[in-house]
């Protein structure tokens, strides 16, 4: 189905808006993946706050101009599926990585975060906000407990010297 100029402009504008509001982007090739599997991926993406779209490469190049994802232009070869993470930078990467494990034909081409091409593994392992807070609290709690133990040990040693 051929797209007229207005349709193309609408697609470019839509993808550009998604790119401007996104925290990260991941590019993949979904050739050979069944429609049923792609429907499952789209459903998972919606639930995770990820915007996914298959876009023609020429339209995608125009859509990402002037955004942080312009660095991905070299990966726009062949059928291109782009996913933008809206709530957490690693969400799209994590989603695509899990999907690629289950589907051999699904190939992740690249990812970008803060205007730079990043490794998908790096993005997928970024902690969520809640995980980061939990790690910080655990570290603080551990440090406080260790300091308290050292204080009691010093007090015990001081009392033993005095006796």
From Swiss-Prot:
Gene: rplJ
GO cellular component terms, semicolon-separated: large ribosomal subunit
Family, per entry: Belongs to the universal ribosomal protein uL10 family.
Matching Gene3D superfamilies: 3.30.70.1730, 6.10.250.2350
Domain of life: Bacteria
Species the sequence originates in: Haemophilus influenzae (strain 86-028NP)
Keyword Protein biosynthesis part of the UniProt annotation: no
Keywords: Ribonucleoprotein, Ribosomal protein, RNA-binding, rRNA-binding
Quaternary structure (record): Part of the ribosomal stalk of the 50S ribosomal subunit. The N-terminus interacts with L11 and the large rRNA to form the base of the stalk. The C-terminus forms an elongated spine to which L12 dimers bind in a sequential fashion forming a multimeric L10(L12)X complex.
Function recorded in the entry: Forms part of the ribosomal stalk, playing a central role in the interaction of the ribosome with GTP-bound translation factors.
Name assigned to this protein: Large ribosomal subunit protein uL10
Molecular function in Gene Ontology: large ribosomal subunit rRNA binding; structural constituent of ribosome
TM helices/strands, residue ranges: none
Stretch forming the signal peptide: none
GO biological-process terms attached to the record: translation
